[in-house]
A protein has these predicted regions:
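Bacterial Sec-dependent N-terminal signal peptides
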Residues: 1-25
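Generic recognition of cysteine residues
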Residues: 6, 11, 75, 166, ...
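Short coil-to-helix leader/linker segments, especially the first N-terminal amphipathic alpha-helix
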Residues: 6, 11, 53-61
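Generic detector of contiguous secondary-structure segments
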Residues: 12, 60-69, 191-199
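Outer-membrane beta-barrel porins/channels
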Residues: 21-47, 94, 108, 112-316
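Transmembrane beta-strand segments of Gram-negative outer membrane beta-barrel proteins
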Residues: 27-52, 70-87
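Outer-membrane beta-barrel translocator/receptor signature
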Residues: 55-134
Length: 316
């Protein structure tokens, strides 16, 4: 008789940022584009600097590279809930700010469906918006007179996903994520007695892909090499601007804003020896496709290296 065991794997993820009760960032950069992008914010991946591409382990639901799902213990159903806290500090033009933030980061449920077919479902953040700062500028034509503006923002996009991994051969796995991106963002600017509030909301379907080649290279030593790819996807955002004065509040339905989920590609590898795991990722994200309503703001593509080390104590 086949016995299925259930494993609940809660994680409290410690990193380092500050501020609002229900935001996951306090970065002023989150006011641009789709906000601050999230990646690897769950379980073992966060404690290893977010490495994901070449990671596979019997208790790790790797939704960044779904090919890694094929390493899950076939006799268990896994549920994972993650949260995190972080501390951030920013300095600009002689002033500085710091904030401490934290929140739920992911929930997923997964396991083996058939002999070579593994699946996971869940919800995780896609991007965060969370900032608060003030800016003072001298009024043109009135030396010594300054106008102070207050900027704030909350919200972000979430991702509901269905991940599938397939073990093609003993050493080769492929995977695919089917994603539904949804959410809303609120951006506020306050100047004197006037408040301008911009609310944007949208949704889009999206898919990304991964593969892993994995094999033992020595006694109790395993090497995994992986790759991931996500294509550029258009997302249309409903755009409502509300102008509030001392005695009036007027909403305006603006033209929908077109943004893009940026194309990305990543390669990585991991080496597991006994209780130690070493992993390295390279990620390229094409942020240059993002649009900005401010002509002074230009987005640039990003190149990122991640290096992580993990040790499992006795009993794990």
């Amino acid at each position: 008789m086949k016995v299925t065991r259930y494993l609940l794997y809660p994680c409290l993820l410690m990193a380092a940022s500050a501020s609002a009760q229900n935001t996951m960032t306090s970065s002023p950069y989150s006011m641009f584009g789709l906000g601050e992008m999230a990646s690897g914010l769950y379980g073992q991946n966060t404690s290893m600097a977010g490495v994901t591409v070449g990671m596979r382990e019997g208790m790790l639901m790797n939704i960044e590279n779904p090919a890694g799902l094929t390493a899950l213990d076939s006799c268990k159903l896994f549920a994972e809930a993650s949260a995190f806290v972080k501390n951030e500090r920013y300095r600009s033009d002689g002033s500085s700010s710091s904030a401490f933030t934290g929140n739920f980061s992911a929930f997923s449920l997964g396991g083996r469906i058939m002999r070579r077919w593994y699946m996971s479902v869940g919800v995780t953040p896609y991007s965060f918006v969370g900032y608060y700062f003030k800016s003072s500028q001298e009024l043109e034509g009135s030396p010594g007179t300054f106008v102070t503006s207050t900027f704030s923002g909350t919200g972000g996009l979430s991702k509901a996903f269905l991940s599938q991994g397939f073990l093609l051969t003993k050493h080769l796995s492929v995977g695919m994520n089917l994603n539904f991106i949804f959410g809303n963002m609120t951006l506020n600017e306050i100047q004197s007695a006037m408040t301008v509030s911009r609310e944007m909301s949208g949704r889009s379907f999206y898919a990304d892909f991964g593969l892993q080649y994995h094999r033992p290279i020595a006694r109790e030593t395993f090497l995994t090499v992986g790759a991931i790819y996500g294509y550029k996807q258009r997302i249309s955002l409903k755009n409502t601007v509300t102008v509030t004065g001392s005695n009036t509040e007027t909403p305006y339905n603006q033209k929908r804003v077109t943004q893009y989920l940026p194309q990305y590609i990543g390669i990585g590898s991991s080496l597991a020896h006994k209780k130690w795991t070493y992993a390295l990722d390279y990620l390229f994200r094409q942020y240059g496709v993002l649009n900005s309503s401010d002509s002074r703001v230009k987005f640039r593509d990003s190149h990122e290296l991640r290096l992580g080390v993990c040790y499992f104590p006795n009993g794990f």
